[in-house]
Amino acid sequence: MSDLRRIRALLREVERRRARNSLAVYAGLHIPAEIEADDLPGLHKLSLPARYIPAAHHRLILEKLQEVEAGKIKRLMILSAPGTAKSTYASVLFPAFYMGRHPTHSVVCASQTQDLADRFSRRARNAVGSEIHRSVFGSGLAQDQRAAGHWETEQGGEYHATGVQPFAGRRADLFLTDDLIRGRADADSKIVRESTWQWILGDLRPRLKPGAAWVNINTRYNEDDPSGRILPKEAFGKSGWFEAKDGEKWYVLCLAAVIETPEE
């Protein structure tokens, strides 16, 4: 092996060791493969450089998600406009990293439909089942884990995907909710907003284990969406810690204010 190859191999090993403790480094090992055209409009994944450097708002997302993994934040709300790759980081790479760090834990990811939740699940499963993940954490996906909506780690940790619908038998150490309301039309429907809120009260909250973390990711189209029902009015358009209406202390990462027009 040439000196150059040895240096490259050493650098790869250093990167893998750093990735065990750093979500940002772990994400960097998977990207650009994990960035998709629908996350970054107009940018095809094959056109990305070999080493993707997260944008400033991505670094903020990664920083706060890392604090969730470390137990420093139990309630995190990420509010952002569409097309900012928030789901790639928060609903795909973060649960994969989290399950590498906590391979016996249970993760539930919910979205507006079962199909979208399954899509996040497949991508997270592929990350946990990758050679990259195994080289970082020394373990990975259990054998024969082909189901889109439910899979396990070798140590017995579980990942479950669901739409906004009743689900039984799953309790979570980490609960991810990603755009529970489909878009402006649904957000403007009082019936949809109320049914989504009742799902949160009746299905989500009872599934949180004691000490569990909840990360809510969404684009805001209506002030009466789930985020609006949780947060106090003084939190709108701001980032930081807030005492919420649900009696919990939430950290809000607001990357965009409430969207006022469909074009924004």
Residue ranges and their predicted role:
Residues 1-84, 88-264:
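Short, flexible loop motifs at catalytic/binding sites
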